[in-house]
């Protein structure tokens, strides 16, 4: 089974909705910054799945459709550190905590 990825449009909307800040209330790190090329920027944020994008992933729900797994309702914008933390400690960061 393939991963149910977010579209670029969803990723962009998710980042902009939180002003490119990590959505973890204990972090709130800025996830974008300037690039040495003036019309570019560096992004260190990720659109993370609340319920995993594929079987075997953290918080995977068999009852979800592919469309539901790849929707903005199943997404959270995080810095890379928090994304790793959320996917590693699934007891602390369960679906209800992330929503």
Predicted stretch roles:
Residues 1-19, 30-32:
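A boundary/linker detector
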Residues 2-4, 29-75, 86-93, 98:
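Histidine-centered nuclease catalytic patch
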Residues 22-27, 79:
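Short cysteine-rich clusters marking metal-coordination/redox-active sites
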